[in-house]
């Protein structure tokens, strides 16, 4: 009887433990599922600039992405006078918010005086709905504004596995046949020029290339940020057809606003926008990189504060040991500095293009430059959705 009582007692304890652990697991499942759902469905408001003439869907250029998460908004600005066409893309890598927010300032503030402007805020919209697995990234971040605050989705470098899965053991780039990392089949900046019958990410770049061709884009700009341990940083990466323009922009910015270099797109590295867009279309393709300490492997706590201030003592320590390709000090690399670098570089590209091609000018007003963004904060140029005029509010 004593043995039986002991067995019953142990059995009851085991059942209680199973119930407790099962309950805890269910609680974690509900909590994480709720967080994932809120992240994926967080709505981001865009108050359209008075100069936005039209907002199209990317699927108007390729029906193969219609109804998918990557059927993003495309914003069109028509200049008061004719000129060239410039396409600015943010959100290729949504874990690099400086590029996306710089494009946002154009969407909400730009007024084209000469030429046309096309803006995309969420190049890989799928990647805005997930953060890096195991990276402990925040799911969102908030920018203070004159009217309160605006919250944005934090994203990843790759498309959400919920939208594209599984990954191959080795990713074979089309059409070059080059072998790349398996996960890069979900990287928008490794699948250019795309293909109509490919994965979601490949179909997305195919759609963008159709847009570039049909709209006769003259200059394509892809906005990015990079970790300080990455050698391609604080620079303009250019296709060989854009060398003169990129060097002109770099020279003028380095003389008047901030230092920025020039890199040449490698001809034997495929899938990147600065190579494939220039090869497959009439457009000059450029890629801008700004520093983002949040991405460094040697960073400290991965928090919203670190994302927005760019302050990190561990990245600074790496710099003391000569491991960085860009300087960092106690001031870090705040989001205002990173966004300001991009807005000034885009505006300077328009000015330099116009000097080189006076018969096809580009001119824009209303968008703040580097010093203005730092002085006022980028939130000063984000507009209150509740005060938007009828028909001038859209959702990303």
How would you name each of these model-derived features?
Residues 2-76, 109, 200-207, 211-219, ...:
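C-terminal accessory segments enriched in acidic
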Residues 92-93, 192-198, 332-336:
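Second-shell loop/turn segments in exported
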Residues 78-85:
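Proline/glycine-enriched tight loop/beta-turn segments at coil->beta junctions
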Residues 102-115:
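A short, Lys/Arg-enriched amphipathic alpha-helix followed by its capping loop at the start of a domain
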Residues 92-101:
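Di-metal (Zn2+ and/or Mg2+/Mn2+) metal-binding site signature of metallo-dependent hydrolases
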Residues 88-90:
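Active-site histidine-acidic residue metal-binding/catalytic motifs
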Residues 85-86, 219:
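Structural motif
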Residues 97-98, 113-251:
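Active-site/substrate-binding loop(s) of hydrolase catalytic cores
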């Amino acid at each position: 009887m004593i043995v039986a009582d002991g067995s019953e007692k142990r059995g009851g304890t085991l059942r209680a433990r199973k119930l407790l652990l099962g309950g805890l697991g269910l609680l974690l499942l509900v909590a994480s599922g709720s967080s994932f759902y809120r992240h994926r469905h967080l709505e981001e408001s865009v108050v359209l600039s008075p100069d936005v003439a039209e907002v199209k869907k990317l699927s108007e250029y390729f029906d193969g992405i219609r109804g998918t998460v990557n059927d993003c908004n495309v914003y069109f600005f028509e200049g008061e006078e004719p000129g060239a066409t410039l396409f600015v893309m943010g959100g290729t890598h949504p874990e690099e918010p400086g590029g996306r927010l710089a494009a946002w300032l154009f969407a909400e503030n730009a007024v084209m005086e000469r030429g046309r402007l096309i803006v995309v805020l969420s190049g890989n919209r799928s990647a805005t709905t997930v953060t890096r697995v195991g990276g402990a990234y925040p799911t969102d971040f908030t920018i203070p504004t004159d009217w309160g605050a605006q919250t944005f989705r934090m994203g990843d470098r790759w498309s959400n596995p919920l939208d594209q899965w599984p990954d191959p053991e080795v990713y074979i780039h089309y059409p070059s046949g080059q072998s790349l990392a398996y996960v890069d089949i979900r990287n928008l900046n490794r699948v250019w020029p795309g293909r109509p019958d490919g994965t979601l990410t490949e179909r997305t770049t195919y759609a963008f290339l159709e847009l570039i061709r049909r709209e006769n884009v003259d200059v394509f700009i892809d906005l990015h940020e990079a970790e300080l341990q990455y050698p391609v940083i604080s620079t303009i990466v250019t296709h060989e057809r854009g060398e003169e323009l990129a060097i002109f922009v770099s020279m003028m910015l380095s003389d008047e606003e901030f230092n920025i270099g020039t890199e040449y797109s490698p001809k034997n590295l495929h899938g990147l926008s600065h190579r494939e867009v220039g090869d497959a279309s009439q457009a000059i393709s450029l890629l801008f990189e700004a520093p983002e300490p949040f991405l460094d492997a040697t960073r400290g706590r991965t928090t919203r504060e670190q994302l927005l201030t760019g302050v990190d003592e561990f990245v600074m320590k790496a710099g003391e040991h000569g491991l960085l390709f860009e300087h960092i000090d106690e001031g870090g690399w705040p989001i205002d500095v990173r966004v300001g670098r991009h807005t000034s570089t885009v505006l300077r590209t328009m000015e330099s293009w116009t000097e080189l091609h006076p018969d096809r000018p580009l001119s824009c007003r209303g968008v703040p430059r580097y010093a203005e963004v730092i002085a006022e904060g980028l939130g000063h140029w984000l507009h209150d959705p509740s005060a938007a005029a009828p028909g001038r509010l859209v959702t990303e």
